[in-house]
Swiss-Prot record:
Protein name as catalogued: Chaperone protein TorD
Similarity field: Belongs to the TorD/DmsD family. TorD subfamily.
Record key words, sorted: Chaperone, Cytoplasm
The keyword Lyase is annotated on this UniProt entry: no
Cellular component, GO annotation: cytoplasm
Signal peptide: none
Compartment(s): Cytoplasm
Gene that encodes the chain: torD
Function: Involved in the biogenesis of TorA. Acts on TorA before the insertion of the molybdenum cofactor and, as a result, probably favors a conformation of the apoenzyme that is competent for acquiring the cofactor.
HAMAP family (UniProt xref): TorD
GO biological process: protein complex oligomerization; protein folding
Any single Pfam family the record assigns to this protein: Nitrate_red_del
NCBIfam families: PRK04976.1
Length: 211
């Protein structure tokens, strides 16, 4: 019988769940089915658990408030429009969710370099881990959702130091600038709270892994 991995601890499983949640919320707009899941008692209990960390609580509370207010088609469409304007349409009012835009000196926020070095590096890492970008997600591999999903998978299979090195390089190094850009451009409250929550969570996690 195979012994369980030493990395399959409750703490690492909880970390993986946080990263999966963040990845899912950045991957696409919230539809009715996803909203029902996010409004469920189980999901709300998980949000409450996250809010138990004082540095995460303000952003978690905003996310919960917005989710509670999403009760009709119009409100969901408005939130979808926020997502589209921030992450799908380029230009000055967007907040492109690609690591390469922030990690390459020649990055151009209006015309980001897509499928660049960070995309290639992530593709190699995904292949090495026998993972890949889903065919129904036509985005470069350095999209924030892909990187967060990769960390979720690695949370229970890599040792702490290896995780810390990856998170520091591929997330923590650019999320502060990304979160500021989302906060400056988001016409609503949800995605700027999500971006700040992600940035703070990653920073705290990176610090804990490196301790």
């Amino acid at each position: 019988m195979n012994k369980p991995s030493i990395d399959q601890t409750p703490a690492n499983q909880a970390r993986a769940r946080v990263y999966r949640l963040l990845s899912d919320l950045f991957a696409k707009e919230i539809d009715h089915q996803r909203l029902q899941s996010l409004q469920s008692a189980e999901a709300q209990a998980f949000f409450d658990l996250l809010a138990g960390e004082p540095r995460l609580a303000p952003e978690v509370n905003i996310i919960q408030e917005v989710l509670a207010e999403l009760g009709d088609e119009a409100s969901l469409l408005n939130l979808a429009a926020d997502y589209c304007g921030l992450f799908l349409v380029g230009g000055k009012q967007s907040a492109n969710p690609y690591a390469g835009l922030y990690l390459t000196p020649e990055g151009d926020e209006e015309q980001p370099q897509l499928f660049g070095p960070q995309h290639q590096e992530m593709l190699a890492l995904l292949k090495q881990s026998k993972l890949g970008v889903q065919s129904d997600f036509p985005e470069p591999a350095d999209h924030i959702s892909v990187i967060l999903a990769y960390v979720a998978q690695q949370a229970t299979s890599l040792d702490d130091k290896a995780q810390q090195r990856f998170i520091a390089k591929y997330l923590d190094a650019w999320l502060a600038e990304f979160a500021k850009r989302v906060s400056d451009r988001d016409p609503g409250r949800f995605y700027q709270a999500l971006a700040r929550l992600t940035q703070i969570w990653v920073s705290l996690d990176c610090e804990a892994l490196g301790a």
